[in-house]
Amino acid sequence: MAKTLYEKLFDAHVVFEAPNETPLLYIDRHLVHEVTSPQAFDGLRAHHRPVRQPGKTFATMDHNVSTQTKDINASGEMARIQMQELIKNCNEFGVELYDLNHPYQGIVHVMGPEQGVTLPGMTIVCGDSHTATHGAFGALAFGIGTSEVEHVLATQTLKQGRAKTMKIEVTGNAAPGITAKDIVLAIIGKTGSAGGTGHVVEFCGDAIRALSMEGRMTLCNMAIEMGAKAGLVAPDETTFNYVKGRLHAPKGRDFDEAVEYWKTLKTDDGATFDTVVALRAEEIAPQVTWGTNPGQVISVTDIIPDPASFSDPVERASAEKALAYMGLQPGVPLTDVAIDKVFIGSCTNSRIEDLRAAAEVAKGRKVAPGVQALVVPGSGPVKAQAEAEGLDKIFIEAGFEWRLPGCSMCLAMNNDRLNPGERCASTSNRNFEGRQGRGGRTHLVSPAMAAAAAVTGHFADIRSIK
């Protein structure tokens, strides 16, 4: 029987399945950070249980960390407690931790892939909704809650029901300057922010194959923003070349044997999906969100939509509420909308390819007066690579702030946040009300588009910036 990639991954990890029972899955990798793990470790301690597979569990600090200093006290009392608890828990339970002073420290979904913790064919979980990122490698990766974190720590398994399947095919070739961020925002604009609910999405098509691993990670990272459980891209030579030689990747003959297995991780001819969505890459322009969910998105050349243009009453009401919160008027060109802050970073867009794209725009230019622009590399290795290439100097000379690794302004859990009413061009993944700070207004864009907004002071079409 022909199977989809998701079905192959799921079936390969079923430990036990009984009629009318939720299947029990084996978990290959468990990623841990400071925010969703303290209660889980407390649960182990209360029941005198060890971590079942400490060698398959990897921890880092990211959500709460300061991006201006490595001082654990810098982000406030709650952040300090959570980070100190993580240090204590990892020491006690034998879990490898990339703490503030470790060269590999960074955002959990950047650290995992770059250290070879993430490999094709695996099941990967983390107490974080954007765990879908790792699906770029052909791994079944999804976020879990704190009680599930405890269950995986204790048993290396998790009860998980089968999801529906969705194929999103992006055909043709994207125009120069169009990135994975533009592609995935265009997809969410088509499906809506709940269009993938109950599904695991497989991204395919020529435009997807043409993406680097960084681009595929951006794509899968935002699968959750269309309501999907997880996102997948079947592994290929691009995947194998990225993984080869990384710290935790197989070596020598083991790697060659692994690749032979990984090559089987693709949807069979004749396999059927519950839902199919198609887009043409050449029709995708640079994207900017205008509302308060990622599905409220338009091309940079478009005007702010009129709520009256939405036939669905729920969408119309949502648009009215979003425009009121965002302080926008229908009919205004996006390129007339001024910004206060720019954030280049997050688990969506903080990898070396993202920073190169932003630096290309920033080079020889200056951040517009009155704009604060932050560049936050996703990990220690990304920061070191960027500095080796001189990207930090380009940013600093242009007036951007070059920061230490962390989740930063993606979410208001550290010192990097918006003030009420401030408008931000952000490369992160969520533009919900208050996501970047109470009353803050978030517009999601690609790194190049964020840099363009920084140097012009408003949204600008990257294709028109020479």
From Swiss-Prot:
Q: Which residues bind [4Fe-4S] cluster?
A: C347, C407, C410
Which reaction does this enzyme catalyse, per its entry? (2R,3S)-3-isopropylmalate = (2S)-2-isopropylmalate
Q: Which InterPro entries match?
A: 3-IsopropMal_deHydase_lsu (IPR004430), Acnase/IPM_dHydase_lsu_aba_1/3 (IPR015931), Acoase/IPM_deHydtase_lsu_aba (IPR001030), Aconitase_4Fe-4S_BS (IPR018136), Aconitase_4Fe-4S_dom (IPR036008), IPM_dehydratase_rel_enz (IPR050067), IPMI_cat (IPR033941)
The record's EC number reads: 4.2.1.33
Q: Which GO terms describe its molecular function?
A: 3-isopropylmalate dehydratase activity; 4 iron, 4 sulfur cluster binding; metal ion binding
Record pathway = Amino-acid biosynthesis; L-leucine biosynthesis; L-leucine from 3-methyl-2-oxobutanoate: step 2/4
Pfam families in the cross-refs: Aconitase
Q: Which Gene Ontology biological process is one annotated for this entry?
A: L-leucine biosynthetic process
Cofactor requirements of the protein? [4Fe-4S] cluster
Entry's NCBIfam families?
A: leuC, PRK05478.1, PRK12466.1
Q: Which family does it belong to?
A: Belongs to the aconitase/IPM isomerase family. LeuC type 1 subfamily.
Quaternary context: Heterodimer of LeuC and LeuD.
Q: Briefly state the protein's biological role.
A: Catalyzes the isomerization between 2-isopropylmalate and 3-isopropylmalate, via the formation of 2-isopropylmaleate.
Protein name according to UniProt: 3-isopropylmalate dehydratase large subunit 1
To which species is this protein native?
Salmonella typhimurium (strain LT2 / SGSC1412 / ATCC 700720)
Annotated gene = leuC1
